[in-house]
Swiss-Prot record:
Keyword match Glycosyltransferase: no
Keyword set, alphabetical order: Acetylcholine receptor inhibiting toxin, Disulfide bond, Ion channel impairing toxin, Neurotoxin, Postsynaptic neurotoxin, Secreted, Signal, Toxin
Taxonomic path: Eukaryota, Metazoa, Chordata, Craniata, Vertebrata
Name listed for the protein in its UniProt record: Neurotoxin 3FTx-8a
Tissue expression as described in the entry: Expressed by the venom gland.
Keyword Phosphoprotein among UniProt keywords: no
Residues spanning the signal sequence: 1-21
Cysteine disulfide links: C24-C45, C27-C32, C38-C63, C67-C78, C79-C84
GO MF entries: acetylcholine receptor inhibitor activity; ion channel regulator activity; toxin activity
Function: Binds with low affinity to muscular (alpha-1-beta-1-delta-epsilon/CHRNA1-CHRNB1-CHRND-CHRNE) and very low affinity to neuronal (alpha-7/CHRNA7) nicotinic acetylcholine receptor (nAChR).
GO CC, alphabetical: extracellular region
InterPro entries: Snake_3FTx, Snake_toxin-like_sf, Snake_toxin_con_site, Toxin_cobra-type
Amino acid sequence: MKTLLLTLVVVTIVCLDLGYTLTCLICPERYCQKVHTCRGEEKLCVKRFYDEKALGWRAKRGCAATCPEAKPKETVECCSTDKCNK
């Protein structure tokens, strides 16, 4: 009986862990509310700030498997919790 209970606990923990999917914000607006469910390999939320000459500083948000390297005149922030790229 103890073995069965232990097996059920282990299976439950594994299934819960495999079922988790990160959610990130994906809109360019300053006060973003649009949520996107990331793919399994995407474990980070990203926010990139860049200078768009006519419009000023803009932000691009989304999901990523790895934190991208910043380009010239760009700032990149990565985080790993739901909707952390505000």
